[in-house]
Amino acid sequence: MALLSQAGGAYTVPSGHVSSRTGTKTVSGCVNVLRMKETYVSSYSRTLSTKSMLKRSKRGHQLIVAASPPTEEAVVATEPLTREDLIAYLASGCKSKEKWRIGTEHEKFGFEVNTLRPMKYDQIAELLNSIAERFEWEKVMEGDKIIGLKQGKQSISLEPGGQFELSGAPLETLHQTCAEVNSHLYQVKAVAEEMGIGFLGMGFQPKWRREDIPTMPKGRYDIMRNYMPKVGSLGLDMMLRTCTVQVNLDFSSEADMIRKFRAGLALQPIATALFANSPFTEGKPNGFLSMRSHIWTDTDKDRTGMLPFVFDDSFGFEQYVDYALDVPMYFAYRNGKYVDCTGMTFRQFLAGKLPCLPGELPTYNDWENHLTTIFPEVRLKRYMEMRGADGGPWRRLCALPAFWVGLLYDEDVLQSVLDLTADWTPAEREMLRNKVPVTGLKTPFRDGLLKHVAEDVLKLAKDGLERRGYKEVGFLNAVTEVVRTGVTPAENLLEMYNGEWGQSVDPVFQELLY
């Protein structure tokens, strides 16, 4: 869920057109977003400037930075933001093809090797401090608590239940992405093994109850924990007991964004099936192959799902902004504190009518933070996030970005995907989204099984990687067997559970240990 910043602190809106329901709105010659309304500073920018909030102190090679998002004092408002500014903000993500990058994020469960119990916060703090000291990462603090690390354009952050997340740098090739993952896992293991800590690659916590999971000292999570039970029955499980792997990809124009968004939504259930890896809850099979995916169906319907409006003829940056304006907020960040704004909308904020901050107007930083609290199967920021896959072992951490890069970064392959899915109805897309977490590639679809569609899709992904010319096809080996057999990783785990594991989930902590 962490933000992956794909560029520096200044952003430009490319020349061209941003479509609008009311006609075509021209975004004139590279309007600088900084100049449009205010100084915009990315939450994860390396150029954070501060007053009191971003105290930086050198301790040897270490640099300590305050918690993200800590930038409201660095933002100088000149006049109020408008809806058009928010549209232009998304459009500022457009990049020419040679500047497209791959950003991979993954989460994992830390546990005590001797007891299999989840890591406590004090153990996580020790781990983070040791990684910072040994491998020269900057510490990220919230108050006096360490909550993450930064190094260049990479960051390590903590999910609400202590899940350990790497948000990778934007990289050019899958070889670089996989090397980044390997380097991260080496560093984490080097410290964790000395502490008797292991890390598990799964989509859902297989053994422990919700109340067994420690909570992290992050203000935004306190607000979310209080709000989640009001809007769904599984939101706290999403926060505390799930892990994902996702890839963040670029687009060249509004038209390119629309094509990738539609392809990503249509094929997201196939990614969910290929990477399904969460069949256990509290020590027993839970009836799902991807419990993590199912959990999102009863977390908060205001901010999740398959976004059928993306397939409307009128869809574009403007329509996504209108959607996001009406998704209830979680918080705003003011004076070093998270302000509870749950149930209120950014549309109210834009009008200066936010009950939690009466009379105040939003900054670009507020908008960026709000966009990170929306959780559809594909999410739009200034790049696109493919969000349908369970966490898994390291080979699958490299396979997930390979799958989507192959499908979305080659124009001919992308067109083939759009042709393949063009006549899928909203009801069919919703059916796949809801049934795949239970039946995986064996989900009936039209005249056959989803497995048969996945065979065609995997071939397209391989073709797309071949044509990139970087010898990246091998990264799909981890899912090739899944497609060939129609047997998901979760089904393999269930077979071991019912066989050699003697109906115990404990061996999974060794089987899927990083």
UniProtKB/Swiss-Prot annotation:
<dbReference type="GO" id="GO:0005524">
    <property type="term" value="F:ATP binding"/>
</dbReference>
<dbReference type="GO" id="GO:0043436">
    <property type="term" value="P:oxoacid metabolic process"/>
</dbReference>
<feature type="transit peptide" description="Chloroplast">
    <location>
        <begin position="1"/>
        <end position="55"/>
    </location>
</feature>
<comment type="subunit">
    <text>Homodimer or monomer when oxidized or reduced, respectively.</text>
</comment>
<keyword id="KW-0317">Glutathione biosynthesis</keyword>
<comment type="similarity">
    <text>Belongs to the carboxylate-amine ligase family. Glutamate--cysteine ligase type 2 subfamily.</text>
</comment>
<dbReference type="GO" id="GO:0006750">
    <property type="term" value="P:glutathione biosynthetic process"/>
</dbReference>
<dbReference type="GO" id="GO:0004357">
    <property type="term" value="F:glutamate-cysteine ligase activity"/>
</dbReference>
<comment type="pathway">
    <text>Sulfur metabolism; glutathione biosynthesis; glutathione from L-cysteine and L-glutamate: step 1/2.</text>
</comment>
<dbReference type="GO" id="GO:0009507">
    <property type="term" value="C:chloroplast"/>
</dbReference>
<keyword id="KW-0934">Plastid</keyword>
<comment type="function">
    <text>Participates in the detoxification process.</text>
</comment>
<keyword id="KW-0809">Transit peptide</keyword>
<keyword id="KW-1015">Disulfide bond</keyword>
<keyword id="KW-0436">Ligase</keyword>
<feature type="disulfide bond">
    <location>
        <begin position="178"/>
        <end position="398"/>
    </location>
</feature>
<dbReference type="Pfam" id="PF04107">
    <property type="entry name" value="GCS2"/>
</dbReference>
<dbReference type="InterPro" id="IPR014746">
    <property type="entry name" value="Gln_synth/guanido_kin_cat_dom"/>
</dbReference>
<keyword id="KW-0547">Nucleotide-binding</keyword>
<dbReference type="InterPro" id="IPR035434">
    <property type="entry name" value="GCL_bact_plant"/>
</dbReference>
<dbReference type="InterPro" id="IPR011556">
    <property type="entry name" value="Glut_cys_lig_pln_type"/>
</dbReference>
<keyword id="KW-0067">ATP-binding</keyword>
<feature type="disulfide bond">
    <location>
        <begin position="341"/>
        <end position="356"/>
    </location>
</feature>
<keyword id="KW-0150">Chloroplast</keyword>
<dbReference type="InterPro" id="IPR006336">
    <property type="entry name" value="GCS2"/>
</dbReference>
<protein>
    <recommendedName>
        <fullName>Glutamate--cysteine ligase, chloroplastic</fullName>
        <ecNumber>6.3.2.2</ecNumber>
    </recommendedName>
</protein>
